[in-house]
Amino acid sequence: FFRLCDTGVVGLILGQVIGRWGNFMNREAFGEYTDNLFAMRLPIDAVRQHEITETMWAHVTEGVNYIQVHPTFLYESMWNLVLLCLLLLYWKHKKFEGEIAILYFGGYGLGRCMIEGLRTDQLLLPHTNLAVSQILAGILVVFAIVVEVSVRTKKTQV
């Protein structure tokens, strides 16, 4: 089962690398206004009006018909591509069956936790500013660390 999990996450993360580009095609899952190197311009009429924040509107000047935002789909796609490469490089050095899957969960959760903070369409816990996806991603990271440490500790005790 754990060998199957290791193999399955490789296909899963490759699907995520490719699938995030669907967010670009749909003009969704972007971040707040930015003027950094990776800033992406979206035509205002191609974006749902409720997704344009006050900060974005503040940077729209007369005669300009676009918003300039963080391309969070690109950040996540690139993060997942790097994670995929690292997992494939580590494959021959794994210490136990299922370790690649655990490392994927931890790495994906870490990236998602950071990138999700840039997005403007977050689902927040009621009466808080906490994004549900960031909390779940954080739990995934903690879970991965606990499992990795506990399995390695048990292996060294044998």
List PLM regions with ranges.
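A feature for loop-to-transmembrane-helix boundaries and adjacent hydrophobic helices
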Residues: F1-V158
